[in-house]
Amino acid sequence: NLLSNNPKWVGFANYQQIAKDPLFYNALWVTIEYVILNITLQTLLAVLIAAMMQRLTQSVALRGAMLLPWLISNVIAALVWFWLLDYQIGIVNQFMSSIGMNRTAFFADEFWAIPTIAFVNVWRHVGYTALLVFAGMQTIPKYVYEAAAIDGSTEWRSFWRITMPLIRPVLAMVLVITVTGSFQVFDTVAVTTRGGPVNVTRVFQFY
C-alpha cells in the first residue's frame, strides 16, 4: 500500500495468492463460457439480420430503430430485463405461466443465469453489430451477384461463396469489438446477479 506510512514490498505475493484461489479459476471458466456464448449468438444473429436487411429492406428508419437498444446504458438495459424476467412479477414468467409452462428464475437459476446475461447483452449490441455487417455487405458491387446469377448460382450459394468471403474484414473487426466487450462485462452482472447464484456468474470483472 503506497499510501501507508510503512509500505511493505509484497513482490509476487498477490499473484501467488490468486493462483491458489479456486474462485479465480471459477471466474476464468465463467468468463470464457460467457465470451463464447455471447460472441456466437451476437455474430450469428448480426449476420442473419444484416442478410435479411440486404435482401428484404434497406429502410433508414429500421436502421435507426435497431440502434436504440445500443444507445441505452448497460445498467438501464439490465434493470429492464431484470424486471421483465422477474420470477414473480416479470411479464415473461407471467406469460409462461398463462400458457401452462413452469416459471423460471432466469437470473437465479444456475443453468440459465449465464445464458440470460448473454441474452441481455446480445439484445443490446446485436443491432449495432448487424449494421456494421450490413455496411460491409453494401460495399459488394451488384454486378458480382449478377454475374453469379447468370452462371446459375443460387442466392444461398452466392451468400456463402461471395458475400461471406468479401465481408471477412468486417467480420474480423466485429469479432475484435465483440471479444473486447465480452471480457469487460460487469454492469449486467452487478445489477442482476452480483456474481451469484453460487458464483456461476462471477466473471473476471466481478472477481
List each language-model region with its residue ranges.
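A structural signal for multi-pass alpha-helical bundles of membrane permease subunits
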Residues: N1-Y207
